[in-house]
């Protein structure tokens, strides 16, 4: 997975952190969690706020 795999990242986050408050989540924590996902091989500096917002929104949708 890389930063542009928004849906795949959201699914992986939901599987790994099913009880996390994904609405009130700091982007620094979200970035750290994504970098720690199995199968994630994106560059640590390869994201920005827009990408993190998209991942967070997809994660919220995935949970609903």
Residue ranges and their predicted role:
Residues 1-64:
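A charge-rich, low-complexity, intrinsically flexible signal that marks solvent-exposed coils, linkers
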């Amino acid at each position: 997975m890389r930063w542009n795999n928004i849906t795949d990242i959201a699914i992986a986050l939901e599987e790994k952190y099913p009880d996390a408050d994904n609405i009130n989540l700091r982007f620094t924590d979200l970035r750290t969690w994504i970098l720690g996902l199995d199968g994630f091989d994106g560059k640590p500096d390869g994201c920005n706020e827009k990408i993190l917002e998209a991942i967070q929104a997809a994660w919220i949708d995935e949970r609903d």
